[in-house]
């Protein structure tokens, strides 16, 4: 499907990914002004279940899942014991006993090993779901567009950072067996949805999107959209060498429940008070392109462009 649409491919963490389908600029503007569809099946999906799943999530995540209700989502980080960022992710709560996590593809081994190491103390199990893929439909017209494709009134049932399961009787436009996971989340700064299902179901939805003249969007525009929206990319804007506070992500470290213990809590408390570095946005006044690794010098201070 991607090749037929004129995709140019690049290697991204071992995945052959469409970088664009002809014009990265047009794709970027399409998402800002209308709607576009991304194949982001390179992302990793982990499912967790068991009577202590909520307790496990409260321990391993910097953010606190106690603040969300069933069928809501939360952005968070996982860190090592020193507070270095392993990955950023979105966690989805079905109920206290069942959660889903979507994390980056480049950190698969680190994230899987992190969960495996820390889950032993809890009555909880987890599994990786390579049989599932993800489509992202993003843009100001994404709700109307996806509702039409699925023949389902999404606006009635799903708010920002929440999700639902749709079953086949609700989706006459995509005949399939089983269910479909739809969240109102994204990585563009626009309204949007992410759809998780098996690859056969997603192929049907992709084809329906294309038939409705929804533009396919490549990795290049995905990157410029998230930069424009001020969203970090793990491995570029942050890494295991960085803590949440210097990465402008202190807001996802939740200290509000003083009784909650979580990984690196003590170290992160100290870092919060002493941190001297900070990730900030930069606007170029004149024509030109800022490249990763370039130095920015002001008075006696020196910084470096990350994205």
Could you say what each language-model-derived stretch is?
Residues 88-90:
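Short, surface-exposed charged micro-motifs
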Residues 1-79, 84, 220:
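Acidic, proline/glycine-enriched N-terminal capping motif
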Residues 40-52, 92-100, 138:
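N-terminal glycine-rich flavin-associated loop
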Residues 1-13, 17-19, 25, 93-307:
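Conserved, structured C-terminal
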């Amino acid at each position: 499907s991607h090749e037929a649409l004129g995709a140019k491919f690049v290697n991204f963490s071992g995945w052959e990914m469409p970088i664009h389908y002809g014009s990265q600029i047009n794709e970027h503007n399409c998402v800002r002004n209308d709607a576009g569809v991304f194949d982001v099946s390179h992302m990793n999906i982990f499912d967790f279940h068991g009577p202590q799943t909520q307790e496990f999530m409260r321990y391993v995540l910097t953010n606190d899942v106690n603040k969300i209700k069933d069928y809501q989502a939360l952005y968070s980080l996982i860190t090592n014991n020193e507070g270095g960022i392993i990955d950023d992710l979105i966690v989805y709560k079905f109920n206290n006993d069942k959660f889903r996590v979507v994390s980056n593809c480049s950190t698969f081994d680190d994230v899987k090993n992190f969960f495996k190491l820390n889950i032993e103390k809890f009555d909880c199990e987890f599994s990786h779901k390579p049989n599932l893929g993800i489509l992202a439909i993003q843009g100001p017209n994404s709700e109307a567009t996806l509702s039409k494709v699925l023949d389902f009134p999404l606006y009635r049932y799903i708010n920002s950072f929440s999700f639902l399961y749709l079953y086949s009787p609700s989706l006459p436009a995509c005949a399939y067996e089983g269910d479909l996971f739809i969240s109102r989340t994204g990585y563009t700064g626009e309204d949007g949805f992410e759809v998780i299902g098996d690859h056969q179901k997603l192929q049907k939805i992709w084809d329906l999107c294309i038939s409705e003249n929804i533009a396919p969007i490549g990795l290049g525009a995905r990157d410029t959209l998230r930069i424009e929206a001020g969203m970090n990319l793990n491995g570029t804007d942050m890494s295991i060498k960085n803590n949440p506070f210097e990465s402008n992500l202190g807001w996802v470290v939740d200290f509000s429940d003083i009784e909650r213990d979580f990984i690196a809590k003590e170290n992160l408390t100290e870092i919060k008070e002493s941190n001297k570095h900070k990730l900030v946005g930069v606007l170029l006044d004149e024509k030109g392109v800022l490249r990763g690794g370039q130095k920015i010098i002001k008075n006696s201070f020196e910084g470096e462009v990350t994205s």
